[in-house]
Amino acid sequence: GYDVLTYDYRGVGSSRPERLRGMEASIRDWALLDMAGVVDWVGAELAPERLFFVGHSVGGQVAGLLDNGASIDGMITMSAQSGYWRLQGAEQKLVVGFHMHVTFPMLTRLFGYLPMKRAGAGEDIPKGVALEWARWCRSRHYLLDDETLPLERYQQFQAPVLAYSVGDDKWGTPRAVDAMMSAYPNLQRSHINPKEVGLDSIGHFG
């Protein structure tokens, strides 16, 4: 069997502070500090013979930014897509575009964080995370257009990557997953249709 470690990024889940307003956090912090810190901790404390990474959505998107990515022996991603709004499913493309240009930035600045729970849409998101996400989603190549990131590390990520997309995922459409995951040089792509695996629906969040 395998030892498995899960964790929450700063500002969400069990890593959320009592007061989210005023918290300093960004998606790059999630990658360069939290995710990289987990990889270092696993190496130091568990010393595994091999380290495999499973990333959903943002987890698969940003793993290529790690300065210790060479420690990862293989990665499987699920619905790790470009968030660029024009690559979303036809039913929600315009809605996502409006949210990323107007609603999310406005609400985030108003509340000091993005109040997703009030809308029944999952976790509240720290201000810096929400604004960075919205900015990337307005850009044609998503985070790959952000020259303040260490983008050269994607080409240095040599571990094999198996990237899945899902037939009924309106966020992670096949072309959105292709657009993001093509940044990894050792990529294998696969697509799952829920009916083929005995499920009625999977979507983006399972």
Each predicted region: which residue ranges?
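Conserved alpha/beta-hydrolase
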Residues: 1-18
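Short alpha-helix in the alpha/beta-hydrolase fold that links the catalytic acid
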Residues: 159, 172-183
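Short beta-strand/loop motif that positions the catalytic acidic residue
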Residues: 157, 163-165
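Catalytic histidine neighborhood in serine/cysteine hydrolases
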Residues: 182-202
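Acidic beta-to-alpha connecting loop that harbors the catalytic carboxylate
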Residues: 167-169
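Alpha/beta-hydrolase-fold enzymes
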Residues: 54-141
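Alpha/beta-hydrolase active-site loop
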Residues: 24-45
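Active-site nucleophile elbow and catalytic-triad environment of alpha/beta-hydrolase enzymes
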Residues: 136-153, 159
